[in-house]
Amino acid sequence: MPLALQRSTLEEFFKRTWARRGLAAWLLRPLSAVFGVLSALRRLCYRFGIAKAQRMRVPVIVVGNIFVGGTGKTPLTIWLAQTLRQAGFHPGVISRGYGASSDVPRAVTPDAQAREVGDEPLLIAHRTQCPVMVGRDRVAVAQALLAAHPQVDVIISDDGLQHYRLARDIEIMLFDGRGNGNGWLLPAGPLREPVSRRRDFTVINGSPEETAMPPDVIQMHLSGVMAEPLAATNLPLEDVPSRALRSFSAASTGFSPARILAAAGIGNPERFFAQLRAAGLQFDEMPLPDHYDFVDNPFAAVNADVILITEKDAVKCRQNDALRNDPRVWVVPVTAHLDDAFAEQIVEKLRGHSIA
């Protein structure tokens, strides 16, 4: 069995297990208890100074989740970086860079390969025009970012809630429509840490009725109302001519007689498919493993007139000649929308003395 298929089968098993407290989850519960104790001890070591957290010379904002898999961190990180730039800050972004080939800090340049720096950091760099650096050691990466870009006055860590060695000033925890799953810790459930874990802000990617979260959290909605040909997106997205864009209403009319395939190699493909259905499109679905590398062309034998992919997948597809030149492939960029009051709270915290 191919490795990607094995991974996909294992992912499906755990998705089913983590959705409810069934037999498989109960059998794994003792391991969750051990995991919970070890995780709590680690947090306490940093809280009481037994293990030392490294503080940067600028404030650090961590955007992350405790639910395994994708919850929409990248759109939120992009929104946050753009919001801070508009407020007069000079943000820089650090990330682990899933799939990155180097363990040492590495700058994400416009011509970087996704397999070298990771798909999400490459997308963040394209969308925000902020300095982005990746590496396994968040402290070393943050230090390298500040050394290379001394104008940076706030660091955004894309993921890394559990990387306690990097001291942080603001924590933003993100959930999506899956809520807490069955509410148990790994491996019986999908949670890396308890929901009661301390944080500054809780954001839900989706509607309140889709989650079991409390009502006082901050709502985030993703909108993708445009589609653009992959062949026209070799430049940074902000440089793509507006004539290359088509609204979903136009796409729906123009594509309705055709066979449409929607493909997504993200943590929660159903979120992408639901977004397209809400736009009135009818299509076949191709869920791919998270961070699918697109080294091979999964669409070569597909009988479809139009193939819709996520923006995160597009940064990898552009680096495959067959995919980049396939006129059937269209990209659906998404934009995060959050309440202005949330942006004001973040800016106020950064400008105040509470995180000095």
From Swiss-Prot:
Q: Where does ATP bind?
A: F67, V68, G69, G70, T71, G72, K73, T74
Query: Which chemical reaction does it catalyze?
Result: a lipid A disaccharide + ATP = a lipid IVA + ADP + H(+)
> Nucleotide-binding: present as a keyword of the record?
yes
Query: Which GO CC annotations does the UniProt entry carry?
Result: plasma membrane
- EC numbers: 2.7.1.130
Q: Does the keyword Nucleotide-binding apply?
A: yes
- The domain of life is Bacteria
Alphabetical GO biological process terms: lipid A biosynthetic process; lipopolysaccharide core region biosynthetic process
What role is this protein assigned? Transfers the gamma-phosphate of ATP to the 4'-position of a tetraacyldisaccharide 1-phosphate intermediate (termed DS-1-P) to form tetraacyldisaccharide 1,4'-bis-phosphate (lipid IVA).
Q: Tell me which family the UniProt entry assigns to this protein.
A: Belongs to the LpxK family.
Matching PANTHER family: TETRAACYLDISACCHARIDE 4'-KINASE, TETRAACYLDISACCHARIDE 4'-KINASE, MITOCHONDRIAL-RELATED
- Indicate what this protein is called per its UniProt record: Tetraacyldisaccharide 4'-kinase
Question: What organism is listed for this UniProt entry?
Answer: Herminiimonas arsenicoxydans
